[in-house]
């Protein structure tokens, strides 16, 4: 059983393993792209363009094959969530301690998951919403831009985004949508039968189908209430495997009983205890042309 002493908690595997999976899969980026195994620190990811195969006639000579390599730097970014509670939470008996740990893990997980989206989409610190200078190359920087027109059906802007991605030689198989944009698709019905036009589309983060796209819905796409400057993004469309990311290190749960770990005052003075969890993501975007942004600036 875990003991509420200062330091990292030893959490049973049946508790920590599913929680770590939720951390990795609780964001739109993680849902639509493939994570890479990573070690801690800055690294590189390569993509190769080898062109097409060459036909060789009988007795003919073979020509040279060219390989164009593109290198993308992957940088580590650490996020934490620290929660304070009255120290009475430490007095729980052993059976209740596991319940307390599970409740705390459940509180922390969504914030750490969403941090990946805020970094990859917007290059911002989720606390305060300010742009982080070290985070560069986020999807918001793509030059493939589509202006949403309220008078149009929502699939008009989606089709336009698809066309931009296709023109750059990529497959627009994925879309991350803000809930307000997603709701417009969900509301579309056949004028005669009143059946939904997209019956397999769901309004959650989990993958569903939207007009032939793998779709994930999250308010991290626009970041309302988080971003210091509203980008008015409604969706990111493209091939999300251009995002090279992974979890470099994760710390399950740490109990802090002394000091001032978050600037909120001395724990002992206020009869409090802090629980902290941290995750280090590594990410980089191989090619921003693989993605188009739909926004509503007008």
Predicted regions and their residues:
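Short helix/loop capping segments that flank catalytic or ligand/cofactor-binding pockets
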Residues: 55-57, 93-94, 184-187, 284-286
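Alpha-helical scaffold segments that mediate packing/assembly in large oligomeric complexes
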Residues: 84-168, 293-298
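Assembly/oligomerization interface modules of large self-assembling protein complexes
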Residues: 2-81, 290
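Short loop/turn segments at secondary-structure transitions that flank enzyme active sites
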Residues: 89, 114, 181-183, 221, ...
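A short, structural micro-pattern
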Residues: 66, 77, 169, 209, ...
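Extended oligomerization regions of viral-like shell subunits
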Residues: 149, 155-257, 263-266
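Protruding loop/beta-arch "assembly-hinge" segments enriched in small, turn-prone residues
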Residues: 1-30, 34-35, 255-298
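Short amphipathic
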Residues: 79-85, 277
């Amino acid at each position: 059983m875990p003991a509420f002493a200062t330091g990292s908690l030893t959490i049973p595997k049946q508790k920590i393993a599913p929680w770590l999976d939720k951390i990795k899969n609780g964001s739109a980026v993680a849902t639509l792209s493939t994570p890479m195994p990573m070690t801690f620190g800055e690294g590189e990811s390569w993509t190769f363009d080898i062109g097409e195969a060459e036909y060789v006639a009988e007795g003919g000579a073979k020509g040279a094959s060219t390989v164009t390599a593109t290198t993308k730097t992957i940088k580590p970014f650490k996020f934490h969530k620290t929660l304070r509670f009255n120290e009475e939470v430490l007095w729980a008996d052993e059976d209740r301690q596991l319940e307390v740990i599970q409740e705390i893990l459940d509180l922390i997980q969504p914030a750490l998951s969403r941090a990946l989206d805020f970094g990859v989409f917007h290059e911002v610190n989720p606390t305060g919403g300010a742009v982080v200078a070290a985070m560069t190359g986020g999807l918001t920087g793509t030059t493939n831009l589509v202006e949403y027109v309220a008078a149009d059906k929502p699939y008009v802007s989606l089709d336009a985004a698809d066309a931009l991605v296709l023109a750059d030689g990529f497959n627009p198989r994925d879309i991350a949508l803000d809930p307000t944009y997603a709701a417009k698709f969900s509301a579309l019905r056949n004028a005669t039968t009143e059946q939904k036009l997209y019956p397999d589309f769901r309004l959650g983060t989990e993958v569903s189908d939207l007009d032939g796209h793998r779709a994930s819905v999250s308010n991290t796409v626009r970041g309302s209430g988080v971003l210091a400057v509203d980008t008015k993004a409604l969706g990111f469309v493209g091939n999300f495997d251009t995002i090279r990311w992974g979890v470099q290190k994760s710390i399950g749960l740490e109990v802090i009983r002394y000091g001032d770990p978050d600037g909120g005052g001395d724990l002992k003075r206020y009869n409090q205890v802090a629980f902290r969890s941290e995750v280090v993501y590594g990410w980089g975007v191989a090619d921003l042309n693989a993605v188009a942004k739909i926004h509503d600036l007008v």
